[in-house]
Amino acid sequence: MSSAARQLAAADPTMAALIERLGEIDLETRLRRRSEERPADAYGALLRAIVGQQLSTKAARTIYGRILDLFEGSTPAPEQLLEADEIGLRAAGLSGRKVEYVRDLASHVLAGELELDRLDDLSDEEVVEEIVAVRGLGVWTAEMFLLFHLERPDVLSGGDLGIRKAVQVEYELDEMPTPARVLEIGEPWRPHRSLASLYLWESLANAPAD
């Protein structure tokens, strides 16, 4: 068992039982596997996040692929997105609102208001603040970016529906916890809340059938 898993188990008996039931989850391997499904650069990852909002994984992948096709198979540079024909972007599958969002992302990058190269040097809170300044990018998206792109070790998205469901089941709560309650329950998991999040998501995949 990894040092992080041992610390989680020691900090919380419910998490200890979950770890024993599910076995070892290697944080780096799992995050790397997930990252391989997304663009490698920060700009592409955020662009892909906007495209995929409120869509199934399959639909998001299809639409993102169509957008890449508009730009010869490559992630469009911010300048290209701003100059792109809206009709073409809509035909690829973007809604009018998402066209506005991807262009706002491009504008922030070009204006230097979102300095992607320095995100690695910022705290988690500062990264979230930078990202949510872009229209269409909310706190949840910023938290997933922290976890799966920047691979930060202590990310817990209290508002994530899957995590809330898992916490309700594992902690035997009568009602689904509020985001604030999830963060309260997860306080003992610091500084390994990213690993705890993976265990909670994994618990849903391994839940017994009704």
Write out the residue ranges for each language-model feature.
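N-terminal polyanion-binding entry modules of DNA glycosylases/AP lyases
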Residues: 1-122, 126, 184-210
